[in-house]
Amino acid sequence: DVGKKRSMNQDSIFYTDEAVGPVQNLYIVADGMGGHKAGDVASRTAIEAATEYIRESETRNPVTLLKRSIIYANDKVYKLALSDPDDYAGMGTTFVAAIIDDGTMYVANIGDSRLYIVNSEIKQITMDHSLVEELIRNGQLDRNKGRNHPEKNIITRALGIGDGVVPDFFEVELASDDKVLLCSDGLSNMIEDDEIRDIISGTDDLNEACRKLIDRANYYGGKDNISAVVVAIDWEE
């Protein structure tokens, strides 16, 4: 969703019920940055490149797939920016991706888009690569004050802004009643975690959950583009 304050949606998402190469379940959210159309181009190019790499890959190892696809995507976005500096100089994107394989979720993250696990509680799996998060972790800022910090949108890592990229990786065992949320900061900056949990836990209709999350973020101001992917884990243990 474009939100209430932006004229263009610079977020891109990927989800599918079909296999992507050797991967049965792949989900991605990317939040682009850059002037004019550059943010949209960065997020879209990153997802297209990453999914292309995974689709054509022969390895089945989820961590290897995430690492190599992100390197490939970073190279594509960075070289595109260099090829057209007038339109694309400095463009980049956040990138959070999840592969779910046989009860285990493998997550990669760059920037401040997030992945949560939701059940009776809500747990943020990723760690924001942002100035505010660094201040909080260094004890220089209280977390509650961080939500309204004037520099909360400054990120410290992004995909496509240089010839190298440093993602974080996480591996999580999933339970059969878990739900997974991938989202851009247009959602997580506008809605408290507990309310996100209540909305997702309050319905089994995943499309309805996404609509309610986006509506609520817009209700609170819709200051940025809003993207959400909600996944239900429903296998027999």
Spans of model-derived segments:
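PP2C/PPM-type serine/threonine phosphatase catalytic domain
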Residues: 1-237
